[in-house]
Amino acid sequence: MAGNSIGQYFKVTTFGESHGPAIGGIIDGVPPGLSLNAQDIQFDLNRRRPGTSRYTSPRSEPDIVEILSGVFNEKTTGTSIGLIIKNIDQRSQDYEEIKNLYRPGHADYTYEKKYGLRDYRGGGRSSARETAIRVAAGAIAKKYLYKINKINIRAYLKQIGHIHCDFKDWIYVNNNPFFCPNPEQITELDLFIRNLKKLGNSVGAKVTIIAENLPIGLGEPVFDRLDADLAHALMSINAVKGIEIGDGFSAITKLGSEYRDEITSQGFQSNHSGGILGGISTGQPIIMHIAIKPTSSIKIPGKTVTNHNQETQIITTGRHDPCIGIRIIPIAEAMVAIILMDHILRFRAQCGDRKII
């Protein structure tokens, strides 16, 4: 299987399956001398891991990361960093009844048709379990980016179902299980998700990611534009079905006189472009929004076929999230960090004699 790596100068490769003994990754390109230990990575892993609230999958994984290589005396050596996270709470028996069925909306059908077989236990390689390693790699990138330029990457829940989350302040985002920036809406979100769980259903979401304090000049036209690479990375996350950068789809109804970001001696007067022009960062905040589909693993019967093309019905009985969007926040931050880290290193390789502004 190809497609297990992302990045050029900062390259992340992941391995492992949902119900295998472990998941892991190799991170190449981390400059030497960065202070790093497991606790630097663990904070974001704890934000992503399942079983931390009644609103997410009850699968209880501690997600303790172990650094296998590339760090000595809590400093990166410049060699490949190897990471591993043991899988502890697999319940493969939950999938025995559906091993010969294709779950609608999942990768079961396409994996088996492409490869001729599939790991039916929790989706195998297609499971979001793999994203724990992305979060670990992203935590390393975040630390480096903040160290060199105080680059800050944060995300929050913008919408869940019909509920739009009004932005109040970043201080609230990590203080509730929804990553909601408005404490006044927590009760409404709580009732909505609890009712969904009673119905055995799920719902989609919208997540906003903002990267700040970026230098001007990140991005490699024409095929490695910064916005193209960010879209690639964010669309690689399980369940993400759409992305916009800046005023993306809302630009359809705008006039050129409204949309263009006019410039004065004091800088840009607006940021409709979302911090990227011509595929290159402008130095303004990069603002991204992603759309997340509702999980297809629900307790409401649905039509499907067996691997012998016999029509039947399916009810998913495993442990799943009523809204995947709640857990995507740290994953989205990680993918943005990985891309920005890669482009920082690419900028230095090509334009090393120019100061990062």
From Swiss-Prot:
Disulfide bonds, paired cysteine numbers: none
E.C. no: 4.2.3.5
Cofactor note: Reduced FMN (FMNH(2)).
Any Pfam family the entry gives: Chorismate_synt
Subunit (UniProt): Homotetramer.
Described function: This reaction introduces a second double bond into the aromatic ring system.
The name this protein goes by in its record: Chorismate synthase
Organism: Blochmanniella floridana
